[in-house]
C-alpha cells in the first residue's frame, strides 16, 4: 500500500515569528545558570565576646554586652526585672532612663506600662509621620531646653 505523498514543508526561515534574527538575539541576555540554594538561616552567627564570660577568652579577654549562646536579642531584652536569668545584664545597659513621673502627672497606672502613645496623650499631642504634633485647637509653643 502506498503512502500518500506529503506536501513539502516550508523551510524554517519562511516563518518570521519562529526565526530570531541577529538583532533580536543581541537584545536577549544569555540564559541564567541555576544558582545553588542558599540557606540564610543556617549561616553561622558571629558573636562578640560576652560580658557573662562566654567566649571572652577567644577574643583576647575583651568583654562586651551580647547575647548568650542560643539567646536572641529579643529574648534578652524581653526579660523583666523580676524574671531576669542569673548573670544577665543590668538595666543600666539599656541606655538613658525614662523620664520621671512628675513630667506627666496625668499618666495613670504603673510607670512600666507607659507607652509612646500614652505620653503623647498626656502631653496633649498625637503622633503623625513619626513626630509629635499638636492636637487641633492647641497652640504651638516652641521651647528649647538646654541640659547641663
Curated annotation (Swiss-Prot):
Q: Which stretches does the entry tag as region Disordered?
A: 1-66
* Taxonomic superkingdom: Eukaryota
Q: Where is the composition biased (Low complexity)?
A: 53-66
Additional notes on this entry:
The adjacent MYZAP and POLR2M genes are part of a complex transcription unit. The respective transcripts derive from different promoters and are alternatively spliced. In human, some transcripts of the upstream promoter of MYZAP use exons of the downstream POLR2M gene.
Which protein is depicted?
A: DNA-directed RNA polymerase II subunit GRINL1A, isoforms 4/5
Native organism: Homo sapiens (Human)
Amino acid at each position: 500500500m502506498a503512502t500518500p505523498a506529503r506536501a513539502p514543508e516550508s523551510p524554517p526561515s519562511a516563518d518570521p515569528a519562529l526565526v530570531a534574527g541577529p538583532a533580536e538575539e543581541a537584545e536577549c541576555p544569555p540564559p541564567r545558570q541555576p544558582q545553588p540554594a542558599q540557606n540564610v538561616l543556617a549561616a553561622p552567627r558571629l558573636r562578640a565576646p560576652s560580658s557573662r564570660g562566654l567566649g571572652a577568652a577567644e577574643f583576647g579577654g575583651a568583654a562586651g554586652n551580647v547575647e548568650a549562646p542560643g539567646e536572641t536579642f529579643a529574648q534578652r531584652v524581653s526579660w523583666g526585672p523580676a524574671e531576669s536569668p542569673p548573670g544577665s545584664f543590668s538595666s543600666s545597659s539599656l541606655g538613658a532612663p525614662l523620664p520621671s513621673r512628675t513630667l506627666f502627672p496625668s499618666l495613670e497606672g504603673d510607670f512600666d506600662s507607659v507607652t509612646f502613645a500614652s505620653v503623647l496623650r498626656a502631653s496633649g499631642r498625637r503622633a503623625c509621620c513619626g513626630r509629635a504634633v499638636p492636637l487641633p485647637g492647641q497652640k504651638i509653643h516652641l521651647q528649647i531646653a538646654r541640659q547641663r
